[in-house]
Amino acid sequence: MKSLKITALSLVLVLLLAACGAKNDTPDEPAVDPTPEPPIEQPVEKTPDERINDIIAGMSIEEKVGQLFFVRCPETGAVEDVETYHLGGLLLFGRDYKDANGDWLTEDDFTAALASYQDAAAIPLFIGSDEEGGTVTRASKNPNLFSEPLPSPQELYAAGGLDGLLERTLSYNQKLKAFGVNVNFAPVCDVSTNPDNFIYARSFGQDAQTTADYISSVVPVYAQSGVACVLKHFPGYGNNADTHTGIALDARPYTTFEKSDLVPFESGIAAGAPFVLVSHNIVECMDGAYPASLSAKVHTLLRDTLGFTGVIVTDDLAMDAVKAYAQDGCAAVLAIQAGNDMIVTTDYQTQIPQVIAAVQSGEIAESDIDAHVFRVLHEKQALGLID
């Protein structure tokens, strides 16, 4: 019996040893590394130009063409027309600072009106005003907005020198910005020293270089205020007639423009001015066949010779000088073909469909429209209106 127990115990020990041996003979399984997490792709931030191109790619022809119109604010229906015509900008005149009864708008009412226009726009608007000072003022005539109308540059310069002029320009434009105005159709770059000239009272009243020095100093002041400025009236009025009432022929030689009229524009462009407005003068040494606003040659001069890369805008196409010239009523089509980026006009309800039709027919290439829209949106981006 004792022998059986010993035998059984020995068998158990043998089995245990065999099991241990079997376990030790099994090779170790290799360690498995944890599956690495896929790298998180960081979104590539697009450049400002790429963001603009994305916007343009998503726009219809109607939306693109609408962006090229900086129209006189209609007396009624402005909110509806901003949405219907996809307008790029509204230009305010004296009546737009008054209510339906002819009373001056309060600050709150004026600010609310501009905000309502912006609310109607899929792409934020340029909202412009002519606030040159002196004989051409809009906003500052409203005593609810400003304590006094803005004096002319000549008056401000005579009273306080260049520093005084720049200080007043800054303060007035900062107020415009606070109300919702983001483009001022100023300063006047025309060179005029003759009080009998049409443009004299609106000009700086000094020679070309002194005017150029003023322009190069005042352009950064507009930028500081957050309001874009508009150099006007390219290529310079000189002693010409008023194109609001008819065609003005300028027979001066090109050397005169080189030494005088173009000098302030060159200074303003070098200082970073975002807009240049082209006049309706027929400048024979540049293009004797077309008003400057409708002349491809004048626009080539502005782009290629003066190196301007910003927004070119027409003077008001409702002026008699262009009405008489564009007898078929397609002034906006001619203006865009000439190289303008934006059209200032009152009859946009007629002109916009004509431009759309010209694009659809191939008379105006859509690629040209895209280039104009790009410059418009680039400036809206610079003003912080779009990302």
Predicted regions and their residues:
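Enzymes and membrane/adaptor proteins characterized by extended Gly/Ser/Thr/Asp/Glu-rich
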Residues: 81-211, 233, 238-251, 279-294, ...
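Preference for extracellular/luminal or secreted protein segments
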Residues: 21-81, 305, 324-387
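C-terminal motif of bacterial Sec signal peptides marking the signal peptidase cleavage site
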Residues: 16-19
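Phosphate/pyrophosphate-binding betaalpha-module
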Residues: 214-233, 260-273
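Bacterial N-terminal signal peptides that target proteins for export
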Residues: 1-8
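Short, well-ordered coil/turn segments that N-cap beta-strands
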Residues: 67, 88, 122-126, 181-182, ...
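Alpha-helix-loop-beta-strand connector modules within alpha/beta enzyme cores
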Residues: 117-123, 206-227, 292-313
